[in-house]
Amino acid sequence: MDVNPTLLFLKVPAQNAISTTFPYTGDPPYSHGTGTGYTMDTVNRTHQYSERGRWTTNTETGAPQLNPIDGPLPEDNEPSGYAQTDCVLEAMAFLEESHPGIFENSCIETMEVVQQTRVDKLTQGRQTYDWTLNRNQPAATALANTIEVFRSNGLTANESGRLIDFLKDVMKSMDKEEMEITTHFQRKRRVRDNVTKKMVTQRTIGKRKQRLNKRSYLIRALTLNTMTKDAERGKLKRRAIATPGMQIRGFVYFVETLARSICEKLEQSGLPVGGNEKKAKLANVVRKMMTNSQDTEISFTITGDNTKWNENQNPRMFLAMITYMTRNQPEWFRNVLSIAPIMFSNKMARLGKGYMFESKSMKLRTQIPAEMLANIDLKYFNDSTRKKIEKIRPLLIDGTASLSPGMMMGMFNMLSTVLGVSILNLGQKRYTKTTYWRDGLQSSDDFALIVNAPNHEGIQAGVDRFYRTCKLLGINMSKKKSYINRTGTFEFTSFFYRYGFEANFSMELPSFGVSGINESADMSIGVTVIKNNMINNDLGPATAQMALQLFIKDYRYTYRCHRGDTQIQTRRSFEIKKLWEQTRSKAGLLVSDGGSNLYNIRNLHIPEVCLKWELMDEDYRGRLCNPLNPFVSHKEIESVNNAVMMPAHGPAKNMEYDAVATTHSWIPKRNRTILNTSQRGILEDEQMYQRCCNLFEKFFPSSSYRRPVGISSMVEAMVSRARIDARIDFESGRIKKEEFTEIMKICSTIEELRRQK
């Protein structure tokens, strides 16, 4: 079918067509190899932007540190990180003046959160730098390892289960002269296989104790591990992102809680809301500027871009902001919030895996770990790498680079938004005291600036003043990449505004298709994505119907479940045909069992099992929804599940979909190969962790939404719960006296064992 593509756009306004130029179809680019080079780039760039600052040495770790704060004012347009403390504090004061009580109220809200947050908050999140093993781990495992090490070193405040008490342990750990940790290592030995009589390498996992002195421990506690950001579209070069360890995470969480609470009260902030709510909020600001500029004024909007936002931000500036925002608050609260920026001022960047060398002639490959970069001969490297290493060498300690200025990606999104909004806030007429005034939108490093003035000269003056104000706070608006236009057409966080926000549908493209979880979840997610896009993103009925047909086709190819009467031969077609022939009511078969598709755009909100329930054969229904079916390892399914959708940019979104537990909701088994690697010890820890949690959930069925509060340990809580339940069951006659006595005896034994331990 040949279509002339230009015909498609005859009636479409340019703003709608622009979404087709976004690089969101096909697979995104992934990075291979190490991120060491990208990390060195980040460290070197960050120091270059602040190069005229003051050098000092950290007395504890010996790391050289560069402090650009209150440094020389810029004389050119080059990006720079010389924020001026007094300017930042003044911007904060004006922000408070135009929003009376904003900091006070947010502090009160945050204090409540601090008192109530449980330590399991830190198990959220993906890969985390695990300082005990010096590499990345799933967040829950990294937290468990940290707590285990803390307890074996006599730090036990965390046993209360409150995050704030865990953070007290972190503070104490930094004062200790040494910390003892358990590390995993691999032993390899050659043994003869009994069956094949060949020599094979046998790997065993050992655990050994290791002592870290204060300096080594501090370096690890302040380390951010770096990786390459994957799946970034529309970029030629990759870049590094950081993952902090458990010591830093809790403190960052509380700072961001305060900043989030402030952002919610600021009309110019694009965070923390999203989706339609965000569009409505932003449209309000634009409407205000347009209605006020009707007759005498002209109005222009800048689609803004900042140069290297995080690399010019400075943790010391954030410390000044926090000190100001919490100035009338209790001492303990101010201390808790000031620790994150202090740790970031002393942060170390781990350089990753190092470099891989291969010799074509000798067919050899060898890895040069990051720790060796400090003293290896540079003749092996090409020019650009050699320059990088020479530049970074003075900053290296044990394979990590001292990185005092700059913030790594994504750490303080909310707080940096507050900083950006404080500049926009200065644009009101009462502050500019001239004929022009301005407003705008800020979302992390992305901004849109709206300037109103009687004439073009006024607009230019307004933009210039904004540009210079930004420089004073360490923000660098890029003159090359920012674009000015009559108000009414601009772009902000990939939303295109044209007298109202257009749907940028192309950004949703990656989430269409088959997710690959299991047959049940995939069907549910697929139709939910189509439904959501009809609601939120202008997906019209005809296109939605087509999307649905394509999805069903894709689904059938993925799971090889073509209709029972099809001619297509696949690995499953034999079984599916057999089922088709012996089924009386063929309309009741699920698509994944070779049934036909009953979905259309009107019933996308109904799970497939419910849609076909009345049409199913009795015995098919019984097999499909049989919890005792031995061929299926079930997960316990809540009525609503969450899928993690990766939108085209921005953080992964949680998408809810209806889940009906059937024999199609299977979980694939773990790959065997992991069991022979050094990961095995970790896997065993993880399984034990999982078992404990499952057991706990059995005792407290409601614990999925309410954690038992109090100082007791998990075991104590379960024992006391068992006693209460047993007594109730005994008194109501549900269990016999013998059973009751036995339960009580087991409880006493458990307590006795705990005492002996």
Swiss-Prot record:
Tell me which residues make up the RdRp catalytic domain: 286-483
Q: Which UniProt keywords are given for this protein, alphabetically ordered? A: Eukaryotic host gene expression shutoff by virus, Eukaryotic host transcription shutoff by virus, Host cytoplasm, Host gene expression shutoff by virus, Host nucleus, Host-virus interaction, Inhibition of host RNA polymerase II by virus, Nucleotide-binding, Nucleotidyltransferase, Phosphoprotein, RNA-directed RNA polymerase, Transferase, Viral RNA replication, Viral transcription
Where does it localize?
Answer: Host nucleus; Host cytoplasm
What molecular function terms (GO) are annotated for this protein? nucleotide binding; RNA binding; RNA-directed RNA polymerase activity
Catalytic activity annotation:
RNA(n) + a ribonucleoside 5'-triphosphate = RNA(n+1) + diphosphate
As for PTM, the annotation reads:
Phosphorylated by host PRKCA.
Compositional bias annotation for Polar residues: 55-64
A Gene Ontology biological process noted in the UniProt record is: symbiont-mediated suppression of host gene expression
For the motif Nuclear localization signal, give the residue ranges: 187-195, 203-216
EC number(s) on file: 2.7.7.48
Where is the region Disordered? 53-82
Q: Where is this region: Promoter-binding site?
A: 249-256
Query: Per the record, GO CC terms?
Result: host cell cytoplasm; host cell nucleus
Q: Which Gene3D superfamilies match?
A: 6.10.140.720
Q: What does this protein do?
A: RNA-dependent RNA polymerase which is responsible for replication and transcription of virus RNA segments. The transcription of viral mRNAs occurs by a unique mechanism called cap-snatching. 5' methylated caps of cellular mRNAs are cleaved after 10-13 nucleotides by PA. In turn, these short capped RNAs are used as primers by PB1 for transcription of viral mRNAs. During virus replication, PB1 initiates RNA synthesis and copy vRNA into complementary RNA (cRNA) which in turn serves as a template for the production of more vRNAs.
Describe its partners and assembly state.
Answer: Influenza RNA polymerase is composed of three subunits: PB1, PB2 and PA. Interacts (via N-terminus) with PA (via C-terminus). Interacts (via C-terminus) with PB2 (via N-terminus); this interaction is essential for transcription initiation. Interacts (via C-terminus) with human PKP2 (via N-terminus); the interaction competitively inhibits the interaction between the RNA polymerase subunits PB1 and PB2.
- Entry similarity comment: Belongs to the influenza viruses polymerase PB1 family.
Can you say what this protein is called?
RNA-directed RNA polymerase catalytic subunit
Source organism of this protein record: Influenza A virus (strain A/Fort Monmouth/1/1947 H1N1)
The gene for this chain is PB1
